[in-house]
Amino acid sequence: MKKTPSRLFPTYEVGSLPKLPARTSALEGREVADDEMQQLKRLGLKYGVDSAGAEEVIARLQKEKRKPASEERKQLLDFNALLNLRIQEKSGIDFVYDGEARRSEMYRHVVQQVEGFEDLPEMIRSQEEQSYRKSVCVAEPKLKLGALSVLVEEEFAFAENNALHKVKVPLNDPYMIAVMSDNRHYTRIARKQFPEDVWKQEYQAKREFTLALAKDIIRPQVEAVVALGASWIQLDLPCATVNVEHLPIVVEGVNAVVEGIPASFSLHFCYPRRNSLTKKNGYELLYPHVLHLDQRVRHFSLELANADDYESDLAVFAQYNTERKFDLGIGVIDITLGRHREGLYEKPQLVRERILRAAEVLKDPSLVYVAPDCGLRQLKLDRCIRLYEIMVEGAELARRG
């Protein structure tokens, strides 16, 4: 029996945690530094995760100067995943996952398992220190044989079987993959359909690409985890407002993923700083489009601690609550690298104030969930742990009033 979540202001993680350095070094065939091994042992002991197996694998790999075989790799990933679960649970987080311990990177993790994609040689800088290798869609995308096991089945089964708290599964959104890829295949088709209209070419190509990804790449992953027992699935939409003219495509893509599936869905949005000509800004950009989301989409996870105007951004959702209510996971922890480099942390009291302000603006405390702004993979693990603790402490203070 998994722990029952808090009834007021439940907490959750958004998705990623940084990979354990010892695990990463071992997987890549590099020497594991003494401080990396000490961290592995220290965290294993602190969070009650037996590190003996992982230590034995690493010692053997170091002695033989090689990369791990399949079973050795699995041992290291299992240890990292279980450690991430226990870190979240012992920090007091209500809904947990494995910190995406088995995923190399949110984009590459998926496209490497898709036929119809070819890699570009250069790395693309996305934001701050993050970069990724872009792929080109050259044919209709289809999952490779065995892809579901690699992408989600093994990962979810391990998390579900080992988690002591309720599980929320983060997955990619199809539009995100479409934006981050070179859309050569569908652009070629659209140019033939609309030879004189560049805007229609771009729109139709993006729409067809997104829907193909939704139906043939993302939806099968959702169906797989639901078949294994998943009840709450989060789709990550960091690129949702890159082009506000494409918001109908975003909504159509999400609906193609979730339609008819017996689960509850949430969407994670990064803060929508305006990238197209419009009088709207912030989360106002999402409306009225999100009103047309499938009814299975009941929850939004929002980057807010790093937003332009905390109350104004929340007021948008209150304004539309008469038409459709969404539960809101409010970002109360700013995870930007600038704060990380300066060693800055929110105070639990500030987290409390943000939560209570959200409850006041929305006029319904039951709509408010509590989360970091985004996934934490770009930070140091010790900092992530402290941020979780601050978030949970602030939520408890808010429950007291």
Segments predicted by a language model, with ranges:
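Domain-level signal for soluble alpha/beta catalytic cores
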Residues: 1-401
